[in-house]
Amino acid sequence: MNSNSTIGRTTLGESDTISLSFSEPSSSLNSRSTDVVFASTSTLVPQQGSLTSLPPVSSTATPTYYSTSLTYDETLHTSIDVSSTSTLVSSTDSSSSSEQDTYSSQYDPATSSYSIITPSMSIFSSTSPMSSSSSITSEWSSLTSTTPTLSSSATSLSSSWSSLSSPSSLLVSSSLSSSSYSDTKLFSFDSRSSIFSPSTPTVISPSYTYLSSISATSFQISTTSELSSSWFSTISPSTTSNKDTTFPSSSRNTSTSFYSSSLSSTNDFSTISKSSKLSPSASSSTVSISTISVPTSSSVSSSSSKVPSNRPSSSSSSDDTTSAYSSTYTFQSLQSTTSSSIPPTTQTPSTSTISTSPIPTSSQVFNTAAISSSEDSKTIYYFYTQTYDITDSSTTFVTGLPTTIAVAKSEVTSFSAPSSTITADMSFYQHWLDGSLDNNKNQGPSKTNTGTIVGSVVGSVGGILICVLVVWFMLVRKRKAKRHFKENDSFCHEIGRRTGFPTTAQAKEASLQAQDSGSQQRNTETASANNPFSNEFNFKARGNPPPVPPPRNVTATNGSFQNMRSNFMDQENRFSYGSSFTYSSLGSSTQGGFSTLSSNSIRLGRGLDNDISHDERNTVQNNSQGFLREII
């Protein structure tokens, strides 16, 4: 494309705001103190008289004041706000085939207003117009297939302020230096896909999809603007101010492009006809091929949309620009006729004669009556010729094969060769030629069967013996493990092992002592003296338990508790093996009862102790349950 075209005309509205802030703090301190104390003294002077008369009273009051301290800290801030607004009137965007874009912007004169707010200060402010111009020129453009990258560099916006303080006037001048930034973008056509689907021989309508995304364009924007302002202010004398200046600035440039294109093509299928004519009498033949093609038309349309946006400290909008291109391509196919000469060929009939002759049949006569023999001490071997009819799918013949038979002398007196013909297949004859055929059919199968039977019997007996040995070994091992567990892992053995007297050793000693009663008695006495578990179940040999400690002194307020405790102990500890745990725990939880720190032996319960009379003990035993009933 070499023609120039104007994409569109866009009207933009842009707003720029500059804010300056000045802060001037001031503080004041006030103090006040007041203290107040009031003290009063009264004196009573007694006098003689009747009881109904009141005695005179003298009082003295002394006030003292203390003032509290109050501190006030006041801080005042002076702020100056400077704002500037500029509006973009028009913007024109033009492009050509050489990929150079020029952007021009025109701003109308802007009015800047300044305001200063300070306590006890009068301000006279003046306004000044401001104009700015910017030019944007495209440097170069390229199409690449790399990933879209964005690189931008911007120089900071600098501002300088100079202030002059005097008792009567303040002069402030400012200048805004030029700033420039460059933005580089890469545009590339990402993907291209073509789909043709000619499926029928009549009409072909392929679809073509063209996808592209622009990712590289580079252009440089330079902006130069100057701001100058001055004003005269009247300020009260003897004022010192420190001002902080902040100048926020931001810029954003956004450009979005959309490209879409479509290709539609319509093709008519070409019809090809072939005709040939062959003449036996002519000297040549002609083959003509005619091709009929319908013109093919194709149309390509594409559209593009570009949305540029340039926002320095504000937002800007632009109208979408759309361009469409369409082109039509026509393809014409020419008809062609092809002629070729083929030399004639004369077919001469040929006659073939096939003669078949039958396979000659030979007749052989075998003398089967001739028999020869040889013998040893026990066996006679007969040799003769056996007639075989060998039959196959395509061949049949008769032959005689020598045969040997071994017969015991005691079993046969005379032998005659068989005169019948045996029918066999070709494999039998092949085995006889190889020497692998066993002619002695009477002895072979019996010898083979005998070896198989003997081997199976021996293997079965050996397998049964091995299984029996394995089962016996497992049973013996399990019995030993169970016996060891009973001896070493019982409850009594565990207690004896902790105290140094295992029960396993005692059981072995008892079995040895049973042979000699005298030695058994002496060993038992020795063991009872050394083994603390020898008299474990001999209750008569035990000594009397220590006396029960007296109960604690309980006040009269705990009488109900004593009755409750006695009733509770009568019901819960009436069995033979009642423990003193109930007494100790119940007494320790309240004021009464016994001490938990006392080391008492096992209590047998009320009515079973030694300090109770015989009649009372019998009464309690009759009313209480027995040990066997308790276990059940």
Curated annotation (Swiss-Prot):
Glycans are attached at residues 4, 253, 488, 553, 558, 622. Keywords: Glycoprotein, Isopeptide bond, Membrane, Phosphoprotein, Transmembrane, Transmembrane helix, Ubl conjugation, Vacuole. Residues 1-33, 87-109, 236-267, 295-322, 335-359, 506-551 are annotated as: Disordered. It is found in: Vacuole membrane. There is a cross-link at residue 508 (Glycyl lysine isopeptide (Lys-Gly) (interchain with G-Cter in ubiquitin)). Residues 1-18, 506-537 have a biased composition (Polar residues). The modification Phosphoserine is found at residue 624. The keyword Membrane applies. GO terms for cellular component: vacuolar membrane. Residues 19-33, 87-108 have a biased composition (Low complexity). It is a single-pass membrane protein. It comes from the Eukaryota. The chain crosses the membrane at residues 453-473. Belongs to the TDA7 family. This is Topoisomerase I damage affected protein 7. It comes from Saccharomyces cerevisiae (strain Lalvin EC1118 / Prise de mousse). The gene is TDA7.
